[in-house]
Amino acid sequence: MVAKKPRVVVVGAGISGLAAAHRLCGAGGDRFEVAVVEAGDRVGGRILTSEFAGHRVEMGATWVQGVVGSPVYALARDAGALGEEEGRGLPYERMDGFPDRVLTVAEGGEVVDADTVAGPIEELYRGMMEAARAGEAGGGGGVEEYLRRGLRAYQAARSAGGGGGGGKELEEVDEALLAMHINRERTDTSADDLGDLDLTAEGEYRDFPGEHVTIPGGYSRVVERLAAALPPGTVRLGLRLRRLKWGGTPVRLHFADGAPPLTADHVILTVSLGVLKASLGNKDTAGVGAAAIAFDPPLPPFKREAVARLGFGVVNKLFMEVEAVAPSEPEDVAGVQPAAAGFPFLHMAFRGHVSKIPWWMRGTESICPVHAGSTVALAWFAGREAAHLESLPDDDVIRGAHATLDSFLPAAPRWRVRRIKRSGWATDPLFLGSYSYVAVGSSGDDLDRMAEPLPRGPDAAADERPPSPRLLFAGEATHRTHYSTTHAAYLSGVREANRLLQHYRGGANHTT
C-alpha cells in the first residue's frame, strides 16, 4: 500500500478560503494536496480595494472591528498595510478616525441642535443597542420595535418632566432622528428591515476590543499576502462550481464552461450565504442563474433550514466626488464652517417634506467626506435602497444626490457631484449580497448548524469513529459570535482547516 496525500479543494478565494488553504499548507506541512478554486478573476471575495478621485477606497469590507486580538489586524500589520510611507500612500477612508463633530440637519435645511435634540436621541440609540448586545434588552422580536419602544418611553419621560414634551414638531424630529440611526444599524447589519433583525441574537454578537480602524494600504493587501504565501499554482481562477457530488468518496466538483472536473477527499465550501440560498432545492441549476450550485445529494434538512432562516442582506457604498460651485462668505453654521472646512460631516433626518428627494436616497444615514477636508463624500445604503442603487444610471444617481444636498444644505456654497463610484454586491452572481445577520425566527444555533460538516453524525463504522468530513463549510455566516465580519470569515477558514488536521492526527489512514 502506498500512502497518498488527501486532496482538499477549497471553493472560494476570499479571506476564508485563503485562510483555510494557508493553514493546511502551513501547519499541515506536506500532508495535504491543496487546491483553491475561485469563480472570479481575482482573489479577495467581498474584500475589494479600489481607487477613486485620488483616494484609496474600499468597495467591500471596510473596517477592522477591534484591533486587540484581531487576526485580521495582525495580518494587515504583517502585510505592511498599516503604515504607508509618507508621500507614497493615497489618502484613504477614515484616515483621521471618526469625526469629532457632525452636522445634523432635518429635511428642508433646519440644523438640529446637537445638545438638546440630536445628542439625547443618539445617546438613547447607543444605550439601547449596548444593552441589547449585553443581553440586557429583555424580550424577543425585532430590533426596530425595541428601539421604538425606547423612543416612546423617552418622549413620555420628557413630557412628564414638564413643558409638554416639546410638542408635535419636536416629536416628528425625534422620529426622524431615530429613523436616521435605524438606517445606520441597517448598514451595520445588512438587514433591510430592523423588524427582521433578531433582538435576542444581538446579545451573542461580539467585536474584538479596541478601536475600529481602516487599513491604510487597503484591505486587499491582506488577502493578496495570504494568496502569495501559498505554493505556486494553488489558486486557480475562473472556475465556477456548478455541481457538487458529495454523497461518496471522492467528492466530485463540476464547473461551468466545460472546465475539467476535479475530485477531492474533502471540500471546504466558502461561498456566500447568498449563493447557498440561491442553491436551495435545486439539484439541476438550469434556469436558476449563474449563482446556484447543484448539490448531489441535496443538502440535508438541518442545513437547508438554517440557510433559509438566516438573514443575508446587501450593503452598498456610493462614493461621490463633490465640489462647491458657488463661493460663500465664511460663516459659522451650528459650529461648522462649510466654506472653510470643506464638505461637512452631514447626518440627515428625513421628514418627508421635500418630495424631490427620491425614495432610495432616504435610506442613507449620512453623506460624509471620507476624511476631513476631502472632496470625496460617501453614503452607505442597505436593503432595497442598496439594491435599487445598482440599477440606476449614473445620471439618475447624481440627480438624486443633488436633490438631497439641495434640501439639507440649502445655503451657499451649493455642492455638486462631479462623478460617482459605487459597489454592486446584490447583482454580483458570485455573492448575491454582502453579509449575514440573525433574522427573527433564526438564532445563533443556525450559525452553528451552518458550520457543521457533512456527513453529519456517526457512519456505520463498527468503531463508531466520527465520519470523514467530506464537505466542510466556512465563511462569515458560519461563525456564531463574529458573523458578518472579515475576522469571522478568516477564523472559520482556520477552524475548518484545523478540523481536517485533527481528523488526520486522530489516526485516520489514507492509502491506495
UniProtKB/Swiss-Prot annotation:
Biological pathway: Amine and polyamine degradation; spermine degradation
Location(s) in or outside the cell: Cytoplasm
Gene Ontology cellular component list: cytoplasm
Coiled coil spans: none
UniProt keyword list: Cytoplasm, FAD, Flavoprotein, Oxidoreductase
Sequence similarity: Belongs to the flavin monoamine oxidase family.
Described purpose of this protein according to its UniProt entry: Flavoenzyme involved in polyamine back-conversion. Catalyzes the oxidation of the secondary amino group of polyamines, such as spermine and its acetyl derivatives. Substrate preference is thermospermine > spermine > norspermine > N(1)-acetylspermine. No activity detected when putrescine or spermidine are used as substrates. Plays an important role in the regulation of polyamine intracellular concentration.
Protein name per its UniProtKB record: Polyamine oxidase 1
Protein species of origin: Oryza sativa subsp. japonica
